[in-house]
């Protein structure tokens, strides 16, 4: 875009051997009536417009900051027409909602405290390269437009996604990776922060291991995202954040409006705080030593009524100030006790975990279920399996068009003993479900290993701290109960942070397994999930302007000890996948030639519908010729497979049949033998001893070689149609031919 009124700045992101990215900030051409507006480009082919506006008057009756962040995904940005019935954009996609949360979390603490004017930030995706991820660009765009708006905002805030990508030269943290690059990444992390002196203070982290991380680590030797590696990633993000902040500050210095004086509504005046502190501090110290949540809440409410009643006459008409001051005094009392005495609300030490319980198979008929409890937090996980055609279809700007694993999180009001609205999920529930999903995706079996769509539902039945991490634990339990062959168990823990002035110095204390009150009165909610070997997901939110990376690194190590303890409890409840439920569909796979797909489907679907009607099985066909057959019982699935093979694979090998095959490939675990064109079987190394006079075989090539003819018998056909073979030796053939005369002789003797 060109024009004399346009002003711009650029941030150059240098990824070394992975190339450079250019983030360009522009203002002055579009959305001129907004308080602040900015166009942000990444490499000139992805463009976002961010506009920030503020209400002219404070919202009456509000005791919080009314900030709204919205993302508008325009399908024309990717050259597409929306797939909805009306062919226009409707409600925001899950990706857009998660992007809104990603922007809101670092921006909200940066506004001046006490602001009550409504502020709205709208980011519109105007053009996008299908290989780009726009969410992190949106963080920078929203910060830029807010910087320009004249609002009391302590920006700029920079956001960057860094991914640990491996190539021939090793692993490197790469900023602003593309979708295609993430296929070779083991971990990707969104980090937002601001410049604090000579350093960068971190304000938000959202991170996860990738879908391919397990294979990259276990099979290709890529670096595992341990706590130390993740800490290195936080440090690697800092120079990029600094470059982004400097580019924003440069443009803001030339184009920002003067900061407007907005009315600021302090929660209370100093005289109110002093009176409440004198009346309540000592009693609050006793109240917040009560371990039980409901008893503690009741005692706190009674004390609050008592204090407010005693001071109402002295501060007539200032009841809201009294209430806010009571909360602030409570916060100070709790924090000082933690920092000075190293003792928490319920009497635990800083690293102690509440009592844990884990139980599986808690519901009848469902495919998998479990309950996980951590103190008063209680989560029920329920797993449902179905055909792959039931996976979620996605119509968004992302190149991902389908999702096999779907994680839904529900947080009913009764989980905290309150009343409230139930129904469609709110942004918080969508965000918590997405976090639990990201924690578990790296350990899921592949589509080929487990050809099922998986829906996982987490029901928060009781809440007192970290229901999202409880959902991760409950989901691990219920999926194992459902028979999902997870590559490893995953557990999660929520860490907290308390900081305050003690003896004139700022002290930090990291808390393991935080309560709801510690979350409310603390400075940080830091959730970490992972296996016993590495981290699979992280989410960090802070109420401060930023947290030193060294403090976060220490909290990560502290979280690992807690995670290992929780994994022991999970493994004690269930350590291997159970058998599939009798109520779950049995899914088997058959491979047919691509040119036979039309014959199996038949004219207008006549043939496939007839097979489904006759057998009661559910059939879906992939473009590559893979046919998935699902049925509630084995005979139905086998009947459908036979019917399909009769059409597409009329000469399908059966168990017990013998072939003179040709060795086509040798591996460390056996040899692959071609039986017929396009049909191979595995002759496992343990079977080769029959060809070596019963001796143990350590090297396959010592017994057979490529091109050698071998007489084999089919011993097994698995659900995916793969054949297991056994060699047929001369003695076996001779014994088979001698059996008949021997039996005849025995009969005549009798």
UniProtKB/Swiss-Prot annotation:
Protein name, UniProt field: Polyribonucleotide nucleotidyltransferase
Alphabetical list of InterPro entries matching this protein: ExoRNase_PH_dom1 (IPR001247), ExoRNase_PH_dom2_sf (IPR036345), GPSI/PNP (IPR014069), KH_dom (IPR004087), KH_dom_type_1 (IPR004088), KH_dom_type_1_sf (IPR036612), NA-bd_OB-fold (IPR012340), PNPase (IPR012162)
Residue ranges crossing the lipid bilayer per the database entry: none
Subcellular location: Cytoplasm
Main location class: cytoplasm
Cofactor(s) it depends on: Mg(2+)
Domain (S1 motif): residue spans on this chain: 656-728
HAMAP family xref list: PNPase (MF_01595)
Enzyme Commission number(s) from the entry: 2.7.7.8
Alphabetic keyword roster: Cytoplasm, Magnesium, Metal-binding, Nucleotidyltransferase, RNA-binding, Transferase
Compositionally biased region (Acidic residues): 730-750
Single GO MF descriptor: magnesium ion binding
GO cellular component, one term: cytosol
Domain KH residues, every copy: 585-644
Similarity comment text for this entry: Belongs to the polyribonucleotide nucleotidyltransferase family.
Keyword set includes Transferase: yes
Binding residues for Mg(2+): 519, 525
Superkingdom as given in the UniProt entry: Bacteria
Positions of the UniProt region annotated as Disordered: 725-750
Single biological process term from Gene Ontology: RNA processing
Catalytic reaction list: RNA(n+1) + phosphate = RNA(n) + a ribonucleoside 5'-diphosphate
Pfam families: KH_1, PNPase, RNase_PH, S1
Protein function: Involved in mRNA degradation. Catalyzes the phosphorolysis of single-stranded polyribonucleotides processively in the 3'- to 5'-direction.
